[in-house]
């Protein structure tokens, strides 16, 4: 695929050159074809956001995640999405952000505490053993879209890229996920797992799709409604009600 080849070239380039190339790339080289079509209406906003991160990176700011992973969530075909898990912005710790909400590289140790809490709740909910790694890509292969509301961050500065244009792109993305219809005109199967107030704020964009809402898994809030919320079994029950296959949430022992 041309897009995969183009993104591979970004991975091979030096840090700033990778970011510098992003604003001029065709949408089809940055994401799956159906995402390119769905986000064409916010292409100008997307290129503006990419130009912002390119300027930051070439100006010496350590931007996370890597250029090749900024739009990683959109490499997964839109047509395959059946669960949306919405995060806030990427982890600001260098080496953590990989372009998928809540996930880290399979080699990252220790894993972030929010992800540890997600594993703890998964064990309580489904009886699945926690993993020592934070690679969640096995979920994306089953139609779980791990999308952050904001797609970049400056290292060490959580929330630093809020209000820089990403929100328009992710608003369009959530709207596109919720707006899919089958041949009978019915909404395609979808469950949104919304952790925390920021995620919950997108609920009006979901077109009535079922949601699982709770506190955020952050150590600051997990004990105030995340633990015991059983998001994984509830999401699977809602998928079955829509005639969709449940997600196999168990992750490989090693990535």
Regions found by a protein language model. Name each.
Residues 1-13:
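A charge-rich, low-complexity, intrinsically flexible signal that marks solvent-exposed coils, linkers
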Residues 24-28:
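Intrinsic low-complexity, intrinsically disordered segments
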Residues 21-22, 88:
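Short, charged low-complexity linear motifs
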Residues 29, 33-194, 198-206, 210-213, ...:
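A polyanion-binding, active-site-adjacent surface
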Residues 14, 18-19:
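N-terminal low-complexity, Pro/Thr/Ser-rich intrinsically disordered segments
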């Amino acid at each position: 695929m041309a897009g995969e080849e183009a993104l591979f070239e970004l991975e091979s380039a030096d840090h700033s050159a990778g970011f510098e190339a992003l604003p001029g790339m065709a949408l089809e080289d940055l994401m799956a074809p159906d995402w390119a079509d769905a986000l064409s209406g916010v292409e100008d906003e997307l290129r503006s956001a990419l130009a912002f991160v390119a300027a930051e990176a070439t100006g010496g700011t350590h931007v996370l995640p890597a250029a090749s992973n900024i739009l990683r969530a959109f490499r997964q075909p839109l047509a395959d999405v059946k669960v949306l898990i919405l995060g806030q912005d990427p982890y600001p710790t260098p080496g953590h952000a990989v372009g998928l909400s809540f996930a880290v590289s399979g080699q990252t140790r220790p894993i972030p505490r929010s992800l540890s809490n997600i594993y703890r709740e998964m064990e309580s909910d489904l009886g699945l053993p926690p993993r020592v790694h934070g690679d969640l890509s096995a979920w994306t292969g089953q139609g779980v879209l791990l999308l952050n509301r904001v797609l970049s961050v400056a290292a060490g500065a959580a929330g630093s890229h809020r209000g820089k244009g990403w929100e328009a792109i992710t608003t369009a993305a959530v709207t596109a996920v919720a707006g899919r219809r089958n041949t009978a005109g019915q909404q395609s199967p979808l469950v949104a797992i919304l952790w925390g107030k920021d995620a919950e704020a997108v609920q009006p964009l979901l077109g009535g799709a079922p949601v699982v809402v709770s506190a955020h898994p952050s150590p600051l809030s997990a004990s105030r409604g995340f633990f015991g919320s059983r998001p994984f079994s509830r999401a699977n029950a809602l998928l079955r009600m829509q005639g969709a296959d449940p997600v196999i949430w168990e992750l490989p022992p090693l990535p």
